[in-house]
């Protein structure tokens, strides 16, 4: 842990304004965003699974509110055009998730751990990581996003022995707790800490 904290301290000063600015955007979305805005963010999180944040951002810009109203085949075609690896399947997930419209604002404002579990159980294409990602991107600070970049970093620094191939609730919470302790030692919430880790790995602060 100590070596990772040293690496993070070296980038803290340059990363902090970017992290704070990005998190303000997240909080604004959670507080002021409409159900449609929140649904578009949920759809972004569906798309980034087994793809990339950059691809998801590109798709979000191209499709916009089309996530809410485009017919299935049109949405699949749009995802094909932006280069998604699984356009048909992801379009099916997004269309099926429209049943959650009207519930998202309450989820964002509710208990983050209960909201995450609800999304894992009820949203298509959303697992523990994706549900954490959505809630963090709407201003929730308490959850860790255990994506492959973060897990590789954790393994490299001896925080975990191996990268899990899949997530059960128990396993996700166990690894999340390890990362939470590192975040606390760094003096940040898990949600913000993730952005510092991204800056360390990528040299930028995505979402």
Curated annotation (Swiss-Prot):
Transmembrane segments: none annotated. Keywords: DNA damage, DNA repair, Glycosidase, Hydrolase, Lyase, Multifunctional enzyme. This is 8-oxoguanine DNA glycosylase/AP lyase. Catalyzes the excision of an oxidatively damaged form of guanine (7,8-dihydro-8-oxoguanine = 8-oxoG) from DNA. Also cleaves the DNA backbone at apurinic/apyrimidinic sites (AP sites). It catalyses: 2'-deoxyribonucleotide-(2'-deoxyribose 5'-phosphate)-2'-deoxyribonucleotide-DNA = a 3'-end 2'-deoxyribonucleotide-(2,3-dehydro-2,3-deoxyribose 5'-phosphate)-DNA + a 5'-end 5'-phospho-2'-deoxyribonucleoside-DNA + H(+). Belongs to the type-2 OGG1 family. It comes from Thermotoga sp. (strain RQ2). Signal peptide: none annotated. The active site is at residues 129, 147. CDD domains: ENDO3c.
């Amino acid at each position: 842990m100590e070596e990772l904290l040293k690496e993070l301290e070296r980038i803290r000063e340059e990363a902090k304004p970017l992290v704070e600015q990005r998190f303000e955007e997240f909080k604004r979305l959670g507080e002021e965003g409409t159900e449609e805005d929140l649904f578009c963010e949920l759809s972004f999180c569906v798309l980034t699974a087994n793809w990339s944040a950059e691809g998801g951002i590109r798709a979000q810009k191209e499709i916009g509110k089309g996530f809410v109203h485009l017919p299935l085949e049109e949405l699949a075609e749009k995802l094909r055009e932006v280069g998604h690896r699984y356009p048909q399947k992801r379009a099916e997930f997004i269309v099926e998730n429209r049943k959650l419209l009207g519930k998202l604002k309450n989820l964002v404002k509710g208990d983050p751990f209960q909201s995450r579990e609800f999304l894992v159980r009820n949203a298509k294409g959303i697992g523990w990581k994706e549900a954490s990602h959505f809630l963090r991107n709407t201003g929730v600070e308490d959850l860790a996003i255990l994506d492959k970049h973060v897990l590789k970093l954790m393994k490299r620094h001896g925080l975990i022995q191996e990268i899990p191939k899949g997530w059960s609730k128990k396993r996700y919470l166990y690894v999340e707790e390890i990362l939470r302790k590192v975040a606390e030692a760094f003096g940040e919430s898990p949600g913000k800490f993730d952005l510092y880790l991204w800056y360390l790995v990528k040299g930028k602060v995505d979402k």
